[in-house]
């Protein structure tokens, strides 16, 4: 699958860029106000008790700031953070090596925690509850269990699939925080801040236009801003103006709802070739040349959220709203 401008996952070349934009304190973090308010209380209370923060589960769509929040938690608690991904912890020994290296109060951030193997997850349970590990050494008759005491720590788990977590793992998190899509006002503020970091000016209309097309996701907003800045610099404009913004977004094929050419391809397939549906997911996948899981995990959620697509027992179906939007878009292109 080619990388899309509106893909909410991080592109391979964006790591350093995203790091440069990330706030380091709660007061700098834009949006997610309910989460910020709760975290301020939880962190202050933990520090007053001289205890680690309870284990925290962050969940929601990609690109909304789960990794950023994990680092902010460590900064606010004034401790170190160790970051790993769920799939990288293949054996109990991998987890034991990391946990035994933590200092009291440290944060362990596990991204994609829903992808932990079952054997690693079972070893994690006593570590989360009672701060010890039971490790089996040897095989067969010579196998024996060794208990390793751990310093108190905070586990921050992040997932885009909270429903895929097992009940025992989910229940061991004392704090559950769901990140929501950002409103246009917060995205506009993020875009203006990013433009300052990039050293470029941007007019108000452009910031609003980019916010509208960013799919409620700061990562998408920053990516679109970078590409619009390319057009501004080639045009030798003193700042980003609305005319350049609309021209650039048109060439990038990102419409006013944040939908790109793949979204249009999928919806036109359902509307034109299958009379609006219902049509099976496998049929759509074959018709547009994409994998079923990619459609289900990457393309569908936003189309459903915007009210253009409906899941039914018989397959996917275009909504009346979709007919209006995509018919108009097709007329404008013709």
Swiss-Prot record:
Residues engaged in binding Mg(2+): 67
Catalytic activity: ATP + H2O = ADP + phosphate + H(+)
Positions annotated to bind DNA: 292, 311, 316
Localization: Cytoplasm
Keyword DNA-binding: yes
MF terms in GO: ATP binding; ATP hydrolysis activity; four-way junction DNA binding; four-way junction helicase activity
Chain residue ranges for the region called Large ATPase domain (RuvB-L): 1-182
GO terms (BP aspect): DNA recombination; DNA repair
Chain intervals for the UniProt region annotation (Small ATPAse domain (RuvB-S)): 183-253
Any GO CC annotation of this UniProt entry: Holliday junction resolvase complex
Gene3D superfamilies: 1.10.8.60, P-loop containing nucleotide triphosphate hydrolases (3.40.50.300), Winged helix-like DNA-binding domain superfamily/Winged helix DNA-binding domain (1.10.10.10)
Record key words, sorted: ATP-binding, Cytoplasm, DNA damage, DNA recombination, DNA repair, DNA-binding, Hydrolase, Nucleotide-binding
The keyword Lipid metabolism appears for this protein: no
InterPro entries attached to this UniProt entry: AAA+_ATPase, AAA_lid_4, DNA_helicase_Holl-junc_RuvB, P-loop_NTPase, RuvB-like_N, RuvB_C, WH-like_DNA-bd_sf, WH_DNA-bd_sf
Binding, ATP: 21-22, 63, 66-68, 129-131, 172, 182, 219
Region (Head domain (RuvB-H)): 256-334
E.C. no: 3.6.4.-
Subunit organization: Homohexamer. Forms an RuvA(8)-RuvB(12)-Holliday junction (HJ) complex. HJ DNA is sandwiched between 2 RuvA tetramers; dsDNA enters through RuvA and exits via RuvB. An RuvB hexamer assembles on each DNA strand where it exits the tetramer. Each RuvB hexamer is contacted by two RuvA subunits (via domain III) on 2 adjacent RuvB subunits; this complex drives branch migration. In the full resolvosome a probable DNA-RuvA(4)-RuvB(12)-RuvC(2) complex forms which resolves the HJ.
Domain notes: Has 3 domains, the large (RuvB-L) and small ATPase (RuvB-S) domains and the C-terminal head (RuvB-H) domain. The head domain binds DNA, while the ATPase domains jointly bind ATP, ADP or are empty depending on the state of the subunit in the translocation cycle. During a single DNA translocation step the structure of each domain remains the same, but their relative positions change.
Family per similarity comment: Belongs to the RuvB family.
Function of the protein: The RuvA-RuvB-RuvC complex processes Holliday junction (HJ) DNA during genetic recombination and DNA repair, while the RuvA-RuvB complex plays an important role in the rescue of blocked DNA replication forks via replication fork reversal (RFR). RuvA specifically binds to HJ cruciform DNA, conferring on it an open structure. The RuvB hexamer acts as an ATP-dependent pump, pulling dsDNA into and through the RuvAB complex. RuvB forms 2 homohexamers on either side of HJ DNA bound by 1 or 2 RuvA tetramers; 4 subunits per hexamer contact DNA at a time.
Protein name according to UniProt: Holliday junction branch migration complex subunit RuvB
Species the sequence originates in: Staphylococcus aureus (strain bovine RF122 / ET3-1)
Lineage, broadest ranks: Bacteria, Bacillati, Bacillota, Bacilli, Bacillales
Gene (name only): ruvB
